[in-house]
């Protein structure tokens, strides 16, 4: 009714957009708010419009309005934050860093701005800056698990393995793995029996997988070191990796390939696999146990695969283009980018992609 009287009432157009946002009709909301901005370029209208663009994933529209917004409102934190976010989402990393810096000069207490900035520093290989940003995050939210986890990774990238491995104990997959074992063996796999690095020379330790196949293969390098410290080593890998550890025992006494009832499961202490470098107290370069290699292929399988797939004189290249996007959206490489590589003469490419992304 107001618009029939005043067809250019920016406040009403913006209010209609806000109401549409509340109804999750984001595209209609954007149409209304864009009209409000055209009539009256008010800072509040721009803030609402950028929020709607973010909800719709229309980050290019934010970047397109970057210049006009900065000319009018160069010191608005909300607008600068969303411009930085839009550049981050559109892979314009250096611009994103610049705008997060500008936003933080206005509001230095923004956890999200520091957290996002730390991620961008990591992408750019500026690991010391990433650590500094995450330390500020930790001051803002001292008990935040995500901060501790990403700070652990950043510290290890700067080769500060002592502090990094300690904070790595906050990782979510550790909690998931120990909780699952506690549910499976409620009377034995308890918090009290978690191995804390103490002497277990004459004791049995039960180590179990966590995270993905690659993590288990990489961290299995610590099993021989653990075997030298304990009386007996039980290891539960993912079912698909059981044959690999049968061929490469790595000091394991029992590779568990099926469910064992609690009454038949005997161990003194237990630990998730990815905790081993920390629990073993490895320092400095000792973290990289067995750099010369510790996993060997099954000779019969290797010969079979050679005849079936690799019976050629070309340079053989295995590729994988996608990780688990539930945890990290940045571990995806569009397959089109491999095309120039495949044009190189005398090469043969093999897909190692499984599960998500294999389609």
PLM regions with names:
Residues 1-359:
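Alpha-helical solenoid repeat scaffolds of the TPR/TPR-like class and their adjacent stem/linker regions
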């Amino acid at each position: 009714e107001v618009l029939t009287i005043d067809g250019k009432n920016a406040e009403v157009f913006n209010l209609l957009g806000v109401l549409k946002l509340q109804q999750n009709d984001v595209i209609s909301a954007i149409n209304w708010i864009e009209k409000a901005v055209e009539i009256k370029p008010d800072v509040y209208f721009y803030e609402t419009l950028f929020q709607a663009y973010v909800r719709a994933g229309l980050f290019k529209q934010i970047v397109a309005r970057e210049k006009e917004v900065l000319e009018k409102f160069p010191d608005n934190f909300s607008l600068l934050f969303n411009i930085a976010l839009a550049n981050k989402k559109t892979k314009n990393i250096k611009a994103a860093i610049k705008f997060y810096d500008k936003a933080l000069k206005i509001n230095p207490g923004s956890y999200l701005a520091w957290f996002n900035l730390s991620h961008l520093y990591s992408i750019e290989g500026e690991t010391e800056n990433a650590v500094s940003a995450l330390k500020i995050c930790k001051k803002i939210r001292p008990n935040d698990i995500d901060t501790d986890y990403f700070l652990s990774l950043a510290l290890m990238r700067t080769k500060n393995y002592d502090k990094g491995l300690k904070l790595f104990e906050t990782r979510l997959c550790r909690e998931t793995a120990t909780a699952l074992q506690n549910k499976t063996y409620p009377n034995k796999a308890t918090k009290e029996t978690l191995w804390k690095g103490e002497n277990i020379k004459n004791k049995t330790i039960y180590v179990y997988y966590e995270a993905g196949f690659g993590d288990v293969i990489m961290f299995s390098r610590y099993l021989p070191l653990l075997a030298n410290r304990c009386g007996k080593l039980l290891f539960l890998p993912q079912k698909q990796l059981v044959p690999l550890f049968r061929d490469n025992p790595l000091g394991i006494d029992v590779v568990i390939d099926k469910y064992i009832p609690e009454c038949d499961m005997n161990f003194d202490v237990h630990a998730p696999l990815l905790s081993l470098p920390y629990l073993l107290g490895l320092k400095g370069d000792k973290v990289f146990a067995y750099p010369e290699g510790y996993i060997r292929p099954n000779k019969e399988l290797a010969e079979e695969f050679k005849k079936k797939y690799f019976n050629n004189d070309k340079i053989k290249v295995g590729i994988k283009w996608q990780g688990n996007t539930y945890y990290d959206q940045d571990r995806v490489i569009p397959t089109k980018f491999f095309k120039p590589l495949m044009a190189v003469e005398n090469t043969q490419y093999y897909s190692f992609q499984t599960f998500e992304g294999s389609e």
